Structures are given as structure tokens and as C-alpha cells.
Regions:
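Active-site neighborhood of HAD-like aspartate-dependent phosphohydrolases
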Residues: 1-45
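Conserved SAM-binding loop
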Residues: 17, 91, 109-113, 144, ...
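An amphipathic alpha-helix signature
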Residues: 25, 29, 52-57, 74, ...
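Helix-loop "lid/cap" segments that line or gate small-molecule binding pockets
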Residues: 31-32, 51-66, 123, 155-156
């Protein structure tokens, strides 16, 4: 079996494994409307990749909401997201083949997401990919979400692999910065059809997961 410089690949979830960013937009716009605020798609984009409690906290502070607590709004959004994932969740192109490629080459595989464990579990069970992952970890258990590197550093610790031997796959700016802040090789796969300037800070930028290959581990 070939030896690689990289010993583990850590996947983000939303927008990388599952095409969930459109679902987050639906859930956020619907629930924010319930609390009396007309939220837009452009506003959703401002907090992509952040933990949902931090998203809600950001907008509560900015817009001075007082009629619902952060926890109440978070619960409503997460409940809606679980429903949407079960109804509409699907793997993004190339994910299954990338997971198979890594597993067949004995590379450790982890998932480190800003989403809650309930959302992570719903997603990987709905998509039937749980068996691929050695470790599944949520930033809800950390002091802060991405771009703070804590979720990636904790995942590496659980894998018992040094951060510089880990490769992160991300789609968002916050996630990319979290990977870089963790001193991990970070590959960006941004939203399909986009080529944001910030993505050039990563080790490499791929158009889709279909471009993933073992050469990226050396």
C-alpha cells in the first residue's frame, strides 16, 4: 500500500458533502420571517459556514430582536432543517467516489461540521455514508465555531493524528480559515459555478469533488 504525507482527510458537511446551503436558506428565511424579520438570500450568504447559534446571535445583535431567545430560534431552524434534509437531502457529485477512494487506501476519514450532532446524524444516515467515517465531530461542542480551528484540532486529536498530517476539505471562507488556522492542508471546493478570490488562499481550489484524487495527499 502506498504511503502518503497526509494520513487523514477531514470533510466539512454543509455545501461539501450535501447540497444543504439552499436548504439552510429556506429554513433561515422561513423561521426569521416567523420572528418578524424579512431575511434575504444575500443575508444568508454573509454567515455561510458559521455555527447556527452564532448566525442567530449575529443577526439578533445587529437587528436588536427581543421577542425570541437565540435558543428558541436555533431550535426552530434546526427542526426545519432536519425535515428538509430527510425530504430533499442528496450527496454532491464526487463525494461517494472520494470516500470510497480514501477508504480503499486506508486513509482515516473524519467529518467536522459547524452543524449540530442531531443534524449531522440526520444527514449521514439519510445519505447512508456513516460507515465511512472514523470520527464525526460537531463544533457545537467547542468554545467557538469556524473560523476558529477548534473543531478541526479536536477532530485530529480524536484521530490521534498530527494536524500537519491532516487535509481539510471545505466549501466556505469560514471553514477554509479554520483549516488554515489549524495548520492543516486545506482544499476549497466552493459553490458550483463560483470561483471566489478568497478560495485562492487554500492549498488548492477544485471545481467539484469529482476532481479529488490521491495526488492531493502528497
Amino acid at each position: 500500500m502506498k504511503n502518503f504525507k497526509i494520513e487523514a482527510v477531514i470533510f466539512d458537511m454543509d455545501g461539501l458533502i450535501i447540497d444543504s446551503e439552499p436548504l439552510w436558506k429556506i429554513a433561515e428565511i422561513e423561521i426569521f420571517k416567523e420572528v418578524g424579520f424579512d431575511f434575504t438570500v444575500e443575508m444568508c450568504a454573509m454567515t455561510t459556514g458559521m455555527r447556527i447559534d452564532e448566525v442567530v446571535g449575529f443577526w439578533r445583535k445587529k437587528l436588536n430582536w427581543k421577542n425570541f431567545t437565540t435558543n428558541e430560534i436555533v431550535y426552530k431552524i434546526q427542526t426545519k432543517m432536519i425535515q428538509l434534509i430527510k425530504q430533499k437531502g442528496k450527496l454532491l457529485p464526487g463525494v461517494y467516489s472520494a470516500l470510497n477512494l480514501l477508504k480503499n487506501n486506508n486513509i482515516s476519514i473524519a467529518l467536522a461540521s459547524s452543524s449540530s450532532m442531531s443534524l449531522i446524524n440526520t444527514t449521514i444516515e439519510t445519505l447512508e455514508i456513516r460507515s465511512f467515517f472514523n470520527i464525526v465531530h460537531s463544533a457545537e461542542n467547542e468554545i467557538a465555531g469556524k473560523p476558529n480551528p477548534a473543531v478541526f484540532l479536536s477532530t485530529a486529536k480524536m484521530l490521534e493524528i498530527n494536524p500537519d498530517k491532516c487535509l481539510v476539505l471545505e466549501d466556505s471562507k469560514a471553514g477554509m480559515n479554520a483549516g488554515l488556522n489549524a495548520n492543516m492542508r486545506t482544499i476549497v471546493i466552493p459553490e458550483l459555478g463560483t470561483s471566489p478570490q478568497w478560495a485562492k488562499k487554500g492549498f488548492k481550489c477544485l471545481r467539484t469533488m469529482l476532481e479529488f484524487n490521491l495526488d492531493l495527499l502528497n
